[in-house]
Amino acid sequence: ENENVLYLNIEAYAGFGGYFPWEEGQDLSHLLYYSRQENDMLCARMTSMVHRMGSLDYVLPIRVTTDLHTVTTEEWQNLFQRLSKESIYETLLLDIGDSVADLMSLLEMCDWIFIPYAEDVYAKAKMEQWQYMLEVLKRQHLNQSEIRINMEQNMRQAVAEAITELRKREGMS
């Protein structure tokens, strides 16, 4: 609430018409294009792409899934570094799906990883597979960055609990 946050949805099917209005205009693929240009016009270009939902700024997600698959880890890193250094945003909130190439490297860049979960047998099996994958890939240290959000709760309550956990871990509680 007290800082500038930019939400970027990096999922293959982000929910146009539901979460996001189906509108024409520039989206995350355009922001990536401008980031690749290596000039100082990224933030100027970005101002026309930023939309607002309540107190949250966001750029429309990539509309065509195949565009998402072509973005390299280095391009994501470059974009995130440039946004951190050149824009007004102190925090980037990334909604990452598994359609991203080299997901683990992208997660390595994050200070915190919020993981939605539920208590049903299928959700538990997915979490077990996630833990197994971290172990096989020798990325168990990512567990220390995880904050889980119980999706069976009221969303406001779940997010409030996640924020409380985050503050506790950062020594702000």
Task: Give a label for each model feature.
Residues 41-50, 60-94, 124:
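Cytosolic-facing regulatory segments adjacent to core modules
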Residues 12-14, 63-66, 120-121:
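Conserved nucleotide-binding/hydrolysis micro-motifs of P-loop NTPases
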Residues 3-58:
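Phosphate-binding loop that captures ATP/GTP phosphates
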Residues 7-9, 58-60, 115, 148-150:
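Structural signal for conserved beta-strand scaffold positions within catalytic alpha/beta enzyme cores
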Residues 9-11, 61-62, 96-97:
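Fold-independent oxyanion-binding glycine-rich loops
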